[in-house]
């Protein structure tokens, strides 16, 4: 990555959260990992992100809490790119995610090469209009 990209990762599975965080940090990103909805809401209120990776289903929350986080994130930071990820994907969830402003939708397990390609092809922070 030419410029450091600020990425929010939200997942309720610690292994996935740590794995994605590790891979993206090694690729040069500044990563904010959040284990669930409450941590994510706090991070969204405090910081602007270039990209967010949001799991749709978060334990301890409504069944599609990640979509609610997507809405909150886009309200606070409309230029943030969002990749929605889920192991429980349906066409309805995909349509809903895209309607709420997701840039991409990925089924789990995540193909890391595909994910890194998406991240590397994002417009850099300096090339985006404010």
Q: What are these regions, as identified by a protein language model?
A:
Residues 64-68, 89-106:
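Alpha4 helix (beta4-alpha4-beta5 surface) of REC/receiver domains from two-component response regulators
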Residues 48-58:
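Active-site beta3 strand of CheY-like receiver
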Residues 42, 64-79:
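Short amphipathic alpha-helix used as the core "switch/output" element in two-component signaling
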Residues 13, 57-60:
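The short loop immediately C-terminal to the conserved phospho-acceptor aspartate in CheY-like receiver
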Residues 92, 110-119:
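C-terminal output helix
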Residues 28-37, 43:
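Short hydrophobic/Thr-rich beta-strand motif most characteristic of the beta2 strand and flanking loop
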Residues 14-32:
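Two-component/phosphorelay signaling modules centered on CheY-like receiver
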């Amino acid at each position: 990555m030419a410029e450091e990209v600020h990425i929010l990762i939200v997942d309720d599975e610690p292994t996935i959260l740590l794995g994605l965080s590790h891979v993206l940090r090694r690729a040069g990103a500044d990563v904010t990992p959040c284990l669930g909805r409450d941590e994510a809401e706090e991070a969204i209120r405090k910081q602007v992100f270039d990209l967010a990776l949001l799991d749709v289903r978060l334990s301890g929350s409504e069944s599609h809490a990640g979509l609610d986080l997507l809405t909150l994130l886009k309200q606070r930071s409309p230029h943030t790119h969002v990749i929605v990820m889920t192991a429980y994907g349906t066409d309805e969830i995909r349509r809903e995610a895209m309607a709420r402003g997701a840039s991409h939708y990925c089924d789990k397990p995540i193909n890391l090469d595909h994910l890194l390609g998406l991240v590397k092809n994002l417009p850099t922070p300096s090339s985006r209009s404010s």
